C-alpha cells in the first residue's frame, strides 16, 4: 500500500513539474496552421516545438507575413498567434482623410474631415478598424443645417420669404422704387451661413475703366475703355497655367470684382491610355498641362465622342469609343408634338444622320444628330428653363473669391486656399441644378515634411523632393527577391512621415547546408536558388539517407533570409 502511494505521489509530482513545459494547442481566431490536419488539436505541445500559421482572407498576422512562425516556450507561444482584421480605406466622397487609399489593421484609428454640410454617422470624427471592419462606415452624409432670416437694407426685397432657411436654399433679390441693385442678385445658404454678401440698392451707379491685367493670363474678348455697371468680362490663362477662383469679373458701381489667379501647372500626363480598336500617333511623354492629342479609330470602326483628348492637371480627359460600323445603333423619333422636315421612312435614322425639326407651339427650328442610337442633343419639345447658380461662395480660409457673377449649370470654379491651409482633395466646386454642390474645406496645414525616409534594399518610385505638404504620399519598392513588409506608401502628417516599409531579406538555398544535412531539392528541375520571405522550398533526403525523427519540416518556409533545413541521417 505504501509502495502504491509512493508511485502515485511521484507520478503526480512529475506531472506538476511538467506543466510549465507544455503549451496548449494553438487555436487561432480567423487563422489556421500549416498542415493542420496532421496534428491532434486536443494534445498539448512540448517546449521548443515550432508551428507555422496563416490568416483568413481580410486578416493578417502582426508580422504581416503569409506564414508566421510561432515557438512553444516556457512562457507560452512566442510570438502570441493572432490574426488582425485588415480594413481598406476608400477615397471619401464629400470629405477627405490622410488615410485615403491605405490599408489599416485592427486597432488603428483614422480621422475623417467631412466637407461643409456633411458628417459621419452619429457625428463621429474618428473611426476605428475592428474585427468586423470599420466601426463606422467611412461615408460623409449630407446633414441638415439652417441660415438665419436675413436682415436687409431698406428697398432690398428677397424671395422666397420663409421663417427658416435650410442649407442649399437660394434667395433672389430685387430693388424697390426702380433703384439699381449693387451686388449679387442671389445668395445661397451654406453650413457656414449665407454667401456671398447681400446686395444694396442705389439711385445712381458708376461705370468702370478697362479690366485689370492678369498675370499669366488675358481677357478673352476685345478690351474696351469703359464698361457699364454689371458688365462682365472673362479671363483665360496662358498655356501651362490653370485658373483659380472665378474666371469672370464684373463691374460693380465703378469697381471690378476680385481677379482670379493663374497658377503654373507642373503636373504632366504620362502615356496616352490605350484606345480599343483605335490608335494615336506615337510620341514620348511627359505631356504638359493643356496639350491635346488626336485619336483615331481603325477602318470599319466609328468614333463615339471627341477625337481629341487633353492633359488637364496631370489627367487625360475621357477617351472616345470605337464601335464597329455594323454594330452602330439607329435612332427613333418619338413625340406627337414634333414636326420634322423629313419624310420619316420607318421613323428610324442611321448613325450620323442629322435632322431639322420644330415643335408644334414653337416656330424656331432645332437640330439634332443620331449618335449610336441616341439623339444629340435629345429630340425634345419640353421647354427647359436655363438655370443659374448664385455667385460662388467665399469658402472659409480660401483666397478671396468676391464676385457678383452668376454661373450656368455645369460651370466650375477652382478654389485656392490661403497660405498655411490645404485643400486635400476636391479643388473645384460645380454649379448643378441652380446650386453649388459639395463644397470642400480648407484645412489648416502648419507643417511640411522633408524628404521621405530611406530604407535598406529599397527605394521610392519617384524622385524625392526637398519638402512635401501635409497629406502627400510617397510609394516604395524593394530590390529583386526582397519582400516588402508594411504599407507600400508613407504619408506626411504633422511634420512627420508615417512608418516606412521594410524590405525583408530573401533566402539563398545553400549547397553546403544541403550536403551537410544529406538533403536535396525535391524538384530537381526547380532550379530555385532564391526564395522571398514567406515562400516555401521543398527538400527530400538523398538516397539512401532517411529523415531524422526530430528533423524540421521538409517544406521549409523562408523567414527573413533564413531557412531551417531538414536533416537526414
Curated annotation (Swiss-Prot):
Chief location of this protein within or outside the cell: secreted
Effect on the protein upon substituting residue 379 to L: Found in patients with atypical hemolytic uremic syndrome
Subcellular location: Secreted
Ligase is among the record's keywords: no
Molecular-function GO terms, alphabetical: complement component C3b binding; identical protein binding; protein heterodimerization activity
Entries under PROSITE patterns matching the protein: SUSHI
Annotated Sushi domain residues: 23-83, 85-142, 145-203, 206-264, 267-324, 329-383, 387-444, 447-505, 507-569
Signal peptide feature range: 1-18
Keywords, in A-Z order: Disease variant, Disulfide bond, Glycoprotein, Hemolytic uremic syndrome, Repeat, Secreted, Signal, Sushi
Database matches in Gene3D superfamilies: Complement Module, domain 1
Pfam families registered for this protein in UniProt: Sushi (PF00084)
Glycosylated residues, chain numbering: 126, 400
CDD domains reported for this sequence: CCP
Effect of residue 105 to R: Found in patients with atypical hemolytic uremic syndrome
Tissue expression remark: Expressed by the liver and secreted in plasma.
Covalent S-S links between cysteines: 23-72, 55-83, 87-129, 114-140, 147-189, 175-201, 208-251, 237-262, 269-311, 297-322, 331-370, 359-381, 389-431, 417-442, 449-492, 478-503, 507-558, 541-568
Biological role stated in the UniProt entry: Involved in complement regulation. The dimerized forms have avidity for tissue-bound complement fragments and efficiently compete with the physiological complement inhibitor CFH.
Disease annotated for this entry: Defects in CFHR5 have been found in patients with atypical hemolytic uremic syndrome and may contribute to the disease. Atypical hemolytic uremic syndrome is a complex genetic disease characterized by microangiopathic hemolytic anemia, thrombocytopenia, renal failure and absence of episodes of enterocolitis and diarrhea. In contrast to typical hemolytic uremic syndrome, atypical forms have a poorer prognosis, with higher death rates and frequent progression to end-stage renal disease. CFHR5 deficiency: A progressive disease characterized by glomerulonephritis, hematuria, renal failure, end-stage renal disease, subendothelial and mesangial glomerular C3 deposits, mesangial matrix expansion, increased glomerular cellularity, and segmental capillary wall thickening. Hematuria may become apparent after respiratory infections.
Oligomer and partners: Head-to-tail homodimer and heterodimer with CFHR1 or CFHR2. Binds C3b in vitro.
Protein name: Complement factor H-related protein 5
Originating gene: CFHR5
Amino acid at each position: 500500500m505504501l509502495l502504491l502511494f509512493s508511485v502515485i505521489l511521484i507520478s503526480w509530482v512529475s506531472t506538476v513539474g511538467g506543466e510549465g513545459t507544455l503549451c496548449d494547442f494553438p487555436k487561432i481566431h480567423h487563422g489556421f496552421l500549416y498542415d493542420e490536419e496532421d496534428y491532434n488539436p486536443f494534445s498539448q505541445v512540448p517546449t521548443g516545438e515550432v508551428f507555422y500559421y496563416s490568416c483568413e482572407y481580410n486578416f493578417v498576422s502582426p508580422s504581416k507575413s503569409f506564414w508566421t512562425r510561432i515557438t512553444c516556450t516556457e512562457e507560452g507561444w512566442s510570438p502570441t498567434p493572432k490574426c488582425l482584421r485588415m480594413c481598406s480605406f476608400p477615397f471619401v466622397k464629400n470629405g477627405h482623410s490622410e488615410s485615403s487609399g491605405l490599408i489599416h489593421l485592427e486597432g488603428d484609428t483614422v480621422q475623417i474631415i467631412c466637407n461643409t454640410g456633411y458628417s459621419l454617422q452619429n457625428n463621429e470624427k474618428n473611426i476605428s478598424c475592428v474585427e468586423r471592419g470599420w466601426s463606422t462606415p467611412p461615408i460623409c452624409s449630407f446633414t441638415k443645417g439652417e441660415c438665419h432670416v436675413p436682415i436687409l437694407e431698406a428697398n432690398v426685397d428677397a424671395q422666397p420669404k420663409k421663417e427658416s432657411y435650410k442649407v442649399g436654399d437660394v434667395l433672389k433679390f430685387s430693388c424697390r422704387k426702380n433703384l439699381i441693385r449693387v451686388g449679387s442678385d442671389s445668395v445661397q445658404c451654406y453650413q457656414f451661413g449665407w454667401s456671398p454678401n447681400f446686395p444694396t440698392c442705389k439711385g445712381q451707379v458708376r461705370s468702370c475703366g478697362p479690366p485689370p491685367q492678369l498675370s499669366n493670363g488675358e481677357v478673352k474678348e476685345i478690351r474696351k475703355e469703359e464698361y457699364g455697371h454689371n458688365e462682365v468680362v472673362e479671363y483665360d490663362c496662358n498655356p501651362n497655367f490653370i485658373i483659380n477662383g472665378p474666371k469672370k469679373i464684373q463691374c460693380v458701381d465703378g469697381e471690378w470684382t476680385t481677379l482670379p489667379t493663374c497658377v503654373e501647372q507642373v503636373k504632366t500626363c504620362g502615356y496616352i491610355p490605350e484606345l480599343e480598336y483605335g490608335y494615336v500617333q506615337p510620341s514620348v511623354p511627359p505631356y504638359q498641362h493643356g496639350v491635346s492629342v488626336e485619336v483615331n479609330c481603325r477602318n470599319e470602326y466609328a468614333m463615339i465622342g471627341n477625337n481629341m483628348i487633353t492633359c488637364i492637371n496631370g489627367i487625360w480627359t475621357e477617351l472616345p469609343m470605337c464601335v464597329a460600323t455594323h454594330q452602330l445603333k439607329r435612332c427613333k423619333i418619338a413625340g406627337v408634338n414634333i414636326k420634322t422636315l423629313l419624310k420619316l421612312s420607318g421613323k428610324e435614322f442611321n448613325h450620323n444622320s442629322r435632322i431639322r425639326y420644330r415643335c408644334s407651339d414653337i416656330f424656331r427650328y432645332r437640330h439634332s444628330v443620331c449618335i449610336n442610337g441616341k439623339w444629340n442633343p435629345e429630340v425634345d419639345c419640353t421647354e427647359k428653363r436655363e438655370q443659374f447658380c448664385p455667385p460662388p461662395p467665399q469658402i472659409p480660409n480660401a483666397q478671396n473669391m468676391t464676385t457678383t457673377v452668376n454661373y450656368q449649370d455645369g460651370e466650375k470654379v477652382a478654389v485656392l486656399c490661403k497660405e498655411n491651409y490645404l485643400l486635400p482633395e476636391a479643388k473645384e466646386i460645380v454649379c448643378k441644378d441652380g446650386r453649388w454642390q459639395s463644397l470642400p474645406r480648407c484645412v489648416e496645414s502648419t507643417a511640411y515634411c522633408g524628404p521621405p525616409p530611406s530604407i535598406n534594399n529599397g527605394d521610392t518610385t519617384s524622385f524625392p523632393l526637398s519638402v512635401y505638404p501635409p497629406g502627400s504620399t510617397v510609394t516604395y519598392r524593394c530590390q529583386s527577391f526582397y519582400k516588402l513588409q508594411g504599407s507600400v506608401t508613407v504619408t506626411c502628417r504633422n511634420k512627420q512621415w508615417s512608418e516606412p516599409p521594410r524590405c525583408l531579406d530573401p533566402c539563398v538555398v545553400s549547397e553546403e547546408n544541403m550536403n551537410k544535412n544529406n538533403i536535396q531539392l525535391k524538384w530537381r528541375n526547380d532550379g530555385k536558388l532564391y526564395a522571398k520571405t514567406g515562400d516555401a522550398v521543398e527538400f527530400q533526403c538523398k538516397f539512401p539517407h532517411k529523415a531524422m525523427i526530430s528533423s524540421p519540416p521538409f517544406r521549409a518556409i523562408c523567414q527573413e533570409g533564413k531557412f531551417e533545413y531538414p536533416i537526414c541521417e
